[in-house]
Regions:
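N-terminal "cap/leader" segments of large eukaryotic alpha-helical scaffolds
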Residues: 1-34, 205-210
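Helix-loop junctions that connect tandem helical modules in alpha-solenoid scaffolds
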Residues: 10-24, 58-69, 97-112, 134-142, ...
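Non-membrane alpha-helical secondary structure
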Residues: 3, 7, 21, 50, ...
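Short, flexible coil/linker elements and helix-boundary hinge sites characteristic
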Residues: 16, 36-39, 87-90, 135, ...
């Protein structure tokens, strides 16, 4: 473990001094770093992977090499897992970087995996439109599963979902189970979510009529 910590510390130090490296070397450094927040969780990594200044450096690298898709994917994956798994508190600058990356092909899939873990996400004005757009992100088979997970997460919090959004969610999920071959277990799982959304919709209509 000490050896792994030393490797991570060395990578962090290099990322702090990222302007000293060319794009090719930096891509290799970023690729090696990304494995740490993504792979097996370790409390020994917490001091480094909750470093807010390190996250700011990663954003700066991403903005500087905005056409390097491979580097951007590793940056988004790194920050996303730092926020989700290691509870890094991201600045608004970091969240804005994620929002900007929702329009980038290939990169946007990795954004969708962890953006809802950001504390700023719940107050983002476009969050509902974004949620509805997730199934259209390539690879679509993985994105619909991610979308379903996000819907279940929202339902578990008992947060009120706007009526029109609930209708959209129902349409997407019903269309998916009607056009896709899946196991009985998965069908039951999706039907359970659909039932909860229908209950949510009924409750919303009842509240409006009162």
């Amino acid at each position: 473990m000490q050896q792994k910590i030393k490797i991570l510390e060395d990578l962090r130090d290099k990322l702090y001094l990222w302007k000293s490296y060319n794009e090719e070397d930096l891509e290799k450094i970023m690729s090696a770093f990304e494995k740490f927040p993504r792979k097996e969780f370790s409390t020994f990594y917490i001091p480094i992977l909750t470093d807010t200044l390190l996250a700011e450096h990663l954003v700066a690298i991403g903005k500087t090499f905005s056409t390097n898709t491979c580097m951007l994917i590793n940056i988004i994956s790194s920050i996303g897992n730092m926020v989700w798994r290691y509870k890094l508190y991201p600045s608004d600058k970091v969240f804005n970087f994620f929002k900007e990356s929702t329009t980038l092909k290939k990169v946007n899939y990795y954004v969708s995996l962890n953006i809802s873990s950001f504390p700023q996400y719940s107050s983002w004005e476009e969050r509902w439109d974004y949620l509805i757009s997730i199934p259209n992100i390539s690879p679509k088979r993985k994105s619909i599963e991610n979308f379903h997970t996000e819907v279940k997460k929202i339902l578990s919090t008992k947060e009120k979902i706007p009526i029109q959004v609930t209708k959209e969610l129902l349409t997407i999920l019903k269309n998916y189970i009607n056009t896709t071959k899946m196991s009985d277990y998965l069908i039951e799982n999706y039907l359970n979510t659909i039932h909860k959304l229908e209950q949510e919709l009924k409750y919303s209509y009842d509240s409006v009529s009162l």
